[in-house]
């Protein structure tokens, strides 16, 4: 629904400035986290690769030190864009983690999250076609593609009008995503304890 509204809005813009993805947002690549393994008994973070973007954090998820740059630490609500391998986007909702290479954390100090999220999403299918054309290497896009990916920026009044519509709905979507993930984690913990016999069902009152 939000995507349709966004597409309809940009299709009907009358006055706008032509820009690019790289000018409306910062695309920060993750690190090769195998170089930042936690030391014994050191606090650590789960490492987010494309598998974790799609399937979530599991007991097989790698860990990294917390001693990494803030730019590659992700938190709930952050926009992620996998630009190599299986190109995809998501809004993160699984807690604090370390971002692995081949995934961008997308941020902006100038434009709202919904704006750069949907503009990046608009170009995703084209990015996938570019990546699919790289037959001799793992499919990916180059950073230069962000520089030539067209973005239409409306006059500020129009942007603010749309912001009043999009922001509450987008925030609700993110909050629901995070709540669903929290409930899923609680369910998995309880199921694990139940399977191990750590929960006595006879003592549970319904």
Can you name each region flagged by the protein language model?
Residues 15, 41-44:
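A short, polar/charged loop/turn motif at coil->beta-strand junctions and beta-hairpin connectors
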Residues 49, 69-125, 130-136, 142:
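A short beta-sheet element
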Residues 137, 149-150:
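Residues marking the start of alpha-helices
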Residues 22-37, 44-76, 98-99:
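Sequence-specific dsDNA recognition surfaces
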Residues 1-32, 53, 152, 156-201:
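Non-catalytic DNA-recognition/assembly elements of restriction-modification systems
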